[in-house]
């Protein structure tokens, strides 16, 4: 992979960017295994409340996404990236004192704000570090931190819940982003365009954002309700379905990450949509968690192609000083997908 052969300090900065992102998404991934037992156990809530925690997270991320994009263009990706870790850690800390649904909603909102800042700034940073003909691959490789965290987080949290207790899993929500924040000290960052950056959002990013909304719905269905669904269907194993999805996306980013640059963003996006529909259909009818893992693997591979392909559509026609705003609009589609899917899937469950 050409990106791995970039000269220092860009190569070092790219590796550190991925490792820092892993810490943030490890915490976010862990929360998906923690919320269902917390809501239905200690808080005495329902599946609908679980669904609304996803929606609150998504709405907070959506609203914060636009401010994060403008902040990246005007104040720099480094600052916005660091702020994201701070919000994730603060939201995780509230899990320890969540005695009712309202406090949990606030915690999830803070995590959503943190995700918006961290994810948008991280993508902008990755694109800056990569050569133009490898931007799709750079987005894919940055996605390694996302999907490694989302695959390892639920499994790690579930193991801690099963063998130690819910309180032990909640520590992941705080410690992981704090360590990530410390790890990014001194990293090479992109320049700040405070004078040339505007206050509007590029139109070129709106259509790719709508396509990404579909991916958000699929992901919300898997990571938000796999635990509850397979507790009912098969007596457990939902966390492993989430893990299979994240692991497949992780591997797909490595093996397939070059395809958007080689095949083109449009052709790659169409293929990804087709396979995503096949995968989610398998999960929908699977009677056992291990069969659902097959569908999750297909969905994960499709997502590993869909996200960078659509991202390339969003940034290729956008000037460098507006790239943060463009990626903010684009990734907002992901939040919209989560916001729509949360209450819908909660009522279906």
What are these regions (language model features)?
Residues 12-46, 50, 219-229:
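Helix-loop boundary and gating motifs at the non-cytosolic
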Residues 174-193:
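C-terminal membrane-cytosol helix-exit motif in multi-pass small-molecule transporters
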Residues 86-99, 275-287:
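C-terminal ends and interior cores of transmembrane alpha-helices
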Residues 64-76, 252-264, 349:
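Helix-to-loop junctions at the C-terminal end of transmembrane segments
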Residues 58-66, 150-151, 249-254, 339:
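Residue-level signature of mid-helix packing/kink "hotspots" within the transmembrane helices
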Residues 107-145, 312-313:
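Cytoplasmic helix-loop-helix junction between adjacent transmembrane helices
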Residues 102-110, 290-298:
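Paired small-residue
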């Amino acid at each position: 992979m050409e990106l791995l052969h970039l000269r220092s300090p860009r190569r070092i900065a790219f590796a550190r960017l991925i490792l820092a992102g892993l810490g943030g998404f490890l915490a976010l991934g862990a929360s998906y295994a923690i919320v269902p037992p917390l809501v239905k156990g200690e808080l005495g809530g329902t599946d609908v409340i679980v669904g609304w925690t996803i929606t609150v997270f998504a709405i907070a991320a959506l609203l914060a996404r636009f401010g994060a994009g403008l902040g990246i263009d005007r104040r720099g990706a480094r600052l916005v990236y660091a702020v994201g870790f701070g919000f994730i850690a603060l939201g995780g800390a509230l899990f320890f004192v969540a005695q009712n649904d309202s406090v949990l909603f606030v915690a999830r909102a803070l995590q959503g704000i943190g995700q918006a800042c961290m994810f948008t700034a991280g993508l902008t940073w990755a694109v800056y570090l990569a050569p133009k003909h490898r931007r799709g691959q750079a987005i894919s490789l940055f996605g390694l931190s996302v999907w490694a965290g989302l695959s390892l987080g639920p499994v790690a949290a579930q193991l801690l819940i099963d063998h130690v207790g819910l309180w032990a899993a909640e520590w992941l929500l705080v410690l992981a982003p704090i360590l990530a924040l410390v790890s990014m000290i001194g990293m090479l960052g992109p320049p700040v365009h405070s004078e040339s950056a505007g206050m509007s959002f590029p139109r070129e990013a709106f259509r790719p954002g709508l396509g990404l909304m579909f991916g958000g719905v699929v992901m919300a269905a898997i990571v938000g309700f796999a635990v509850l669904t397979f507790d009912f269907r098969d007596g457990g194993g939902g966390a492993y379905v989430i893990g299979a999805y994240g692991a497949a996306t992780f591997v797909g980013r490595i093996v397939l990450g070059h395809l958007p640059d080689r095949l083109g963003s449009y052709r790659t996006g169409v293929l990804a949509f087709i396979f995503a529909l096949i995968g989610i259909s398998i999960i929908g009818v699977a009677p056992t968690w291990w069969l659902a893992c097959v569908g999750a693997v297909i969905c994960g591979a499709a997502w590993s192609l869909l996200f960078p392909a659509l991202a390339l559509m969003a940034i290729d026609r956008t000037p460098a000083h507006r790239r943060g705003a463009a990626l903010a609009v684009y990734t907002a589609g992901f939040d919209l997908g989560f916001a729509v899917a949360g209450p819908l899937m909660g009522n279906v469950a």
